[in-house]
Curated annotation (Swiss-Prot):
SUPFAM superfamilies for the chain: Nucleic acid-binding proteins, S-adenosyl-L-methionine-dependent methyltransferases
Protein name (record): Uncharacterized RNA methyltransferase YfjO
Residues bound to S-adenosyl-L-methionine: 296, 325, 346, 394
MF GO annotations: 4 iron, 4 sulfur cluster binding; metal ion binding; rRNA (uridine-C5-)-methyltransferase activity
A Pfam family: TRAM
Residues of the active site: 421 (nucleophile)
Keyword Metal-binding: yes
PROSITE patterns tied to this protein: SAM_MT_RNA_M5U, TRAM, TRMA_1, TRMA_2
Source organism of the structure: Bacillus subtilis (strain 168)
Keyword Iron: yes
């Protein structure tokens, strides 16, 4: 019998060029298209564009490529204003007009729901993304690696895209100007004293990183020098030079990190001069920020985010509220004036100490904070007669712990407010809760303009059958 041979599918090879139409943006800001029904990720490509792509990586389930030529450009494509945008890995969307960034971020939330849930997404209320009037100079903290240029001078910047070569940055346009100014002057001071720069490959040298944080409302600046060893030659002279040339610096700290790691901070922190903290104000609440304290990086958008949390909680003054994964207590304190009682917990003792201090300083007698997990405290409090009406959660990128979600299903608060920094884990967690809770709406918030990140506030309401 003369059987017809089945044609083998066309396989892509690394280096091959091929045409591609970009259908959407991926969760990391890359363009997504399909070649012979296989997904292809192309950094820098935008939805609606027709491009010629060269394959850089070919896997069984997906491929990656780079743009060789744009045949038809998106009407939303703009020239990125940053001179090192192509080399630096910090921003992903400067080449996309800001109004369209906001639309695409809403779409990323929708895509995550379509991929990870069984919801009829077309019937859900996914609100327009809340953006910024000026989507630049918004970051209150910079962490610039220190290295040496080919000519031998000290440089400060970020690691390049997919590399461990430092891209020198003099004026990062998403950073607050005070952090740029401070980092630049500290870099020159280190050069004046010919400080030894840490070499990652050889694991030798002294200074690794300059970390700068500014209080937007107070103008106070903190400088942290991350060193590989406890000894820092010319320490006193460096401190004096910083104080003389940067009077706005109120806190100078040394952090010691000798480990072979990409994590910035080590465990040991030493005060070199000034205060151990700087002050920052959000709305009517002020905070003391130590070198390693977590604090939102975009104060202007944080106020909008927390106002959305308050709106979603719908407080009347009678509710018992739990702030899970509470950190230094920011969200709980933001909503405390509308609640009967707020209780927060976190596994990091230092954060809880800060939360207690912050609540006491503001005279919030209705806010209490404890160390431990929500899985431990929620059932215990419920047994003791404290049944929360509202639970607010702001988990890390990995989403909520499954035991925490099981606890929510048992305790059954009337309202559950989920603050997410990762649409994929948000969608998965909403699906897990879908038997007991309906999603009232989701409000995306743009905390990091020019990047692919999107935050969202989801309001869940207990189903009446419960």
């Amino acid at each position: 019998m003369n059987q017809q041979k089945k044609q083998a599918p066309v396989e892509l090879k690394v280096g091959q060029t091929f045409p591609l139409t970009i259908k959407r943006l991926g969760i990391n800001g890359e363009g997504v298209g399909y070649f012979k029904k296989k997904v292809v990720f192309v950094p820098g490509a935008l939805p609606g564009e027709e491009v010629v792509v060269q394959a850089t990586k070919v896997q069984p389930k997906f491929s990656e490529g780079r743009i060789k030529k744009i045949r038809k450009a998106s009407e939303h494509r703009v020239a990125p204003p940053c001179p090192v945008y192509e080399q630096c890995g910090g921003c992903q969307l400067q080449h996309l007009a800001y109004s369209q960034q906001l639309r695409e971020k809403r779409d990323i939330v929708i895509q995550s729901l379509e991929r990870h849930t069984k919801f009829k997404v077309e019937n859900m209320e996914i609100k327009e993304t809340i953006g910024m009037d000026n989507p630049w100079n918004y970051r209150n903290k910079s962490q610039f690696q220190i290295g040496r240029s080919q000519s031998g001078s000290i440089i400060a910047g970020l690691y390049g895209l997919d590399s461990h070569d430092i891209v020198p940055i003099k004026d990062c346009i998403v950073q607050h100007p005070a952090t740029n100014k401070t980092t630049g002057i500290v870099r020159r001071i280190l050069e004046d004293f010919n400080v030894s720069v840490y070499n990652e490959r050889k694991r030798k040298g002294d200074v690794r990183t300059i970390v700068t944080r500014v209080g937007f409302e107070t103008g106070e600046v903190q400088v942290v020098l991350v060193t590989a060893k406890e000894t820092l030659p010319h320490k006193e002279e460096i401190v004096k030079a910083i104080q003389k040339r940067l009077p706005e610096v109120k806190s100078i700290i040394q952090n010691v990190n000798g480990a072979k790691t990409s994590v910035i901070f080590g465990e040991k922190t030493k005060q070199l001069a000034g205060k151990t903290v700087i002050q920052e104000v959000l709305g009517d609440v002020s905070f003391e920020l130590s070198a390693r304290a977590f604090f939102q990086l975009n104060p202007e958008q944080t106020v909008k985010l927390y106002d959305e949390v308050k709106k979603a909680a719908q407080l009347t003054g009678k509710e018992k509220v739990v702030d899970a994964y509470c950190g230094v207590g920011t969200i709980g304190m933001w909503v405390a004036d509308g609640a009967k009682e707020v209780r927060g917990m976190d596994v990091i003792k230092e954060s809880i100490d800060d939360a207690k201090k912050n609540a006491k300083k503001h005279g919030m007698a209705n806010a209490t904070y404890v160390t431990g997990t929500a899985e431990h405290w929620l059932p215990k409090w419920t047994k003791e007669g404290f049944r929360p009406d509202v639970v607010i959660v702001d988990p890390p990128r990995t989403g909520c712990d499954s035991t925490f979600l099981d606890t929510i299903k048992k305790v059954k608060p009337k309202r559950f407010v989920y603050v997410s920094c990762n649409p994929s884990t948000l969608a998965k967690d909403l699906q897990t809760l879908s038997k007991d809770y309906r999603v009232d709406y989701i409000q995306p918030v743009d905390m990091f303009p020019q990047t692919a990140h999107v935050e969202a506030v989801a309001r869940l309401v207990l189903k009446s059958s419960n």
